[in-house]
Amino acid sequence: MELSLVVPCYNEEGNVRLFYDEVRRVFKNKVTDYEFVFINDGSTDATLDNLKSIYNESKYRDNVQVVSLSRNFGKDSAIYAGLSYAVGDCVCIVDADLQQRPEVVLEMLEILHNNPDTDCVAAYQEERREGKAASAMKSGFYKIINKIAEIDFVNGASDFRLMRRNMVDAVLEMTEYHRFSKGILSWVGFNTEYIPYTVEERASGESKWGFGKLFRYALEGIVSFSTFPLKLSTFVGLFSFVVSILYLIVVVCEKLFKGIDVPGYATIVVLVLLLGGLQLLCLGILGEYLSKIYIQSKNRPIYIIKEHLGKK
C-alpha cells in the first residue's frame, strides 16, 4: 500500500461523503494504491452511519477502513488510533471537512518521491481566514511556546502532514495519554519539509474548536513540552523574596532617619493577598503537572475500539 489517509471524524455527517468523493476525484489516474482510514471519534450525529454506507457501497472495500471509538477521546487520540491502523508506506493526516485540500496531498507525495532524504512533508497555514484577534492569539502562542519549549514549532503548522513509515512507527512509540500531536510530531525529529497551504472554507457544518477549547489545547501543549512554568514558580518566589527585603530596608531607613511609621494594617493586607495569590498560582502550576503524572500512572489505553470495518 503506497498511501494511507488517516481521517479523524467528530460529528462530520455532512462532510465524510463529500471528502470521500472529492479525494477519489482528485486522485483518479494519479494515485491508485491508497486507503482511507476513517476514525469515528464518538460522534453523536450520523457520521458513523455515513461511514458505514461508504464502506458498504465501495467497490474496493480493501481500501476503506472505518474505526469507531467507544466515546469521544479527542482528535489527538483519534489520530493515534488512525496511525495504528494505517498500513501504507506513507501516511497522511487530513481533516474530513475539506479545509485541507486533496491537491495538497498530491503535492506532498511528489515532494517525498523526489526527495528520498525527506521523511515528512508538513503544511502550514499561509493565510488565516479568521478574525484578527484569533490570528493574533495563535501567533502569540507560537512565539511563547518557541521560547520556552525544548523543540521548535513552526507558526501555523498543523497535523496536516505526510510521513514515511519510519516516522509513523516512531510516533506510535510515543504512548503518552495526554497527547499534543503538533509537539509529538516535532519531537520525534526526522527530516521535515514545510510547505504553505490555504485553509479553505468548511464544506459543511461549523468548526468544533471554540476559544475555550483552543485555550485548553494551548495549555496542554505548554505543559506537555515545557518545564518553564515549574521554573517560573522559583523565579516568582525569588522575586518576592528580593522585593520583601528591599521593602524591609525602606521601612527601617524611614523609621531610623525620618521617624516615619509605615501604616501596618494596609501593608499586611496587601502582602497577604499578594503572597497568597502567588502561592495559589504556583500550586496550580504544580497541580497541572501532577495531574498529568497521575493520569499517566494509571496506564489507561489512549483509545478504545468499539467497532472496526475493513482489513488492516
Give residue spans per PLM region.
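Structured catalytic core of nucleotide-sugar glycosyltransferases
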Residues: 1-132
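Residue-level signature of catalytic and energy-coupling elements of molecular machines
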Residues: 5, 23, 82, 97, ...
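Short conserved micro-motifs on helix faces and helix-strand junctions that flank
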Residues: 8, 69-71, 116, 161, ...
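Amphipathic alpha-helical segments that mediate coupling or scaffolding at interfaces
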Residues: 8, 26, 54, 69, ...
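Residues in soluble alpha-helical coiled-coils and helical-bundle/repeat scaffolds
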Residues: 11-14, 99, 103, 172, ...
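Acceptor/aglycone-binding surface of glycosyltransferases and processive sugar-polymer synthases
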Residues: 63, 67-71, 75-85, 90, ...
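Short, conserved catalytic or interaction motifs in soluble domains
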Residues: 71, 96-98, 165, 197, ...
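Hydrophobic helical membrane-anchoring modules
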Residues: 180-312
